[in-house]
């Protein structure tokens, strides 16, 4: 058995596209609902409808659950950043031209 050598006539395209997500995707839209019964109601939409033209999740939350939901989005953003670094580390560690001799 030898090493696998692909045919010289068949070269499937291998896209080198970094795994990135638009940071605006993790923003959200909060609107205070003017309800007489409970003035602490908020409508939160993730991602914002004016940025993302697709599926938008909106829910009505009170103030305590609103902070929990925003904290959940913050943790989700950290997880996606770590996943991006694991899948495509060169996107985060490449040297920018002109900064080769720069040190802290």
From Swiss-Prot:
One of its GO terms (cellular component) is membrane. Disruption phenotype: Displays increased levels of spontaneous RAD52 foci in proliferating diploid cells. Keywords: Membrane, Transmembrane, Transmembrane helix. It is found in: Membrane. The chain crosses the membrane at residues 63-83. It is a single-pass membrane protein. May be involved in a pathway contributing to genomic integrity. This is Increased recombination centers protein 13.
């Amino acid at each position: 058995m030898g090493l696998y050598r692909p045919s010289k006539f068949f070269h499937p395209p291998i896209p080198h596209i970094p795994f990135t997500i638009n940071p605006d995707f993790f923003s959200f839209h909060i609107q205070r609902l003017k309800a007489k019964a409970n003035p602490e109601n908020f409508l939160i939409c993730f991602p914002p409808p004016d940025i993302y033209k697709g599926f938008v999740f909106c829910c009505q939350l009170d103030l305590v659950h609103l902070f929990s939901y925003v904290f959940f989005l913050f943790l989700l953003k950290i997880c996606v950043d770590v996943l991006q670094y694991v899948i495509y580390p060169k996107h985060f560690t490449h040297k920018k031209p002109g900064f080769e001799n720069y040190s802290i």
